Amino acid sequence: MAKYVGPKLKLSRRENTDLFLKSGIRSIDSKCQFDHAPGQHSIRKSRLSDYGVQLREKQKVKRMYGILENQFANYYRKSASMKGNTGEILLQLLESRLDNVVYRMGFGSTRAESRQLVSHKSIIVNDCIVNIASYQVVPNTVIQVYKKSHNQSRIYAALEIAEQQRESVPWIEVDSAKLKGIFKRRPERSELSANINEHLIVELYSK
């Protein structure tokens, strides 16, 4: 599948917020001038149209989870077909992706690194190796690092970063010593980032 391979900080600058695309070892504030868009002579416009605001919100969430347009649109269509709040369901589907759950458990320092762990067959889901990053994790699923991958120092470095810098996620339980965790349930909207306005995304796709 195609993926973005350009500068990650450029994406955060474009969306005017930290998309958590870097490991978090050092703050990106000194590198990212959030009051300016990317480009040597860029000037951030003071006001966007309603469509522009909606589009930027969609782009921000896409880039945060590392998903391209077609796949993101599929997630929206699926969430719209399900009973309940479309925006909240959309975020729950994104949070239930295997690469994101691995990231939330702290086994990868970024979602991109977590996706790599999955694609390299380093992750076991309910006693079976799964190498599909978009695999939808259901409640009460046990996820662990494959024993042959226990010698990867980056996993322990990621766990240390997660323990020091990330907020706790109550829908996930992790045993760092065993490199194992349980996805207990899907998160409630109140437990997810307040920096996401999913209603704008719903408005955009509803046009």
From Swiss-Prot:
It comes from the Bacteria. GO terms for molecular function: rRNA binding; structural constituent of ribosome. Keywords: Ribonucleoprotein, Ribosomal protein, RNA-binding, rRNA-binding. The keyword DNA-binding does not apply. Part of the 30S ribosomal subunit. Contacts protein S5. The interaction surface between S4 and S5 is involved in control of translational fidelity. Belongs to the universal ribosomal protein uS4 family. This is Small ribosomal subunit protein uS4. The lineage of its organism: Bacteria, Pseudomonadati, Pseudomonadota, Gammaproteobacteria, Enterobacterales.
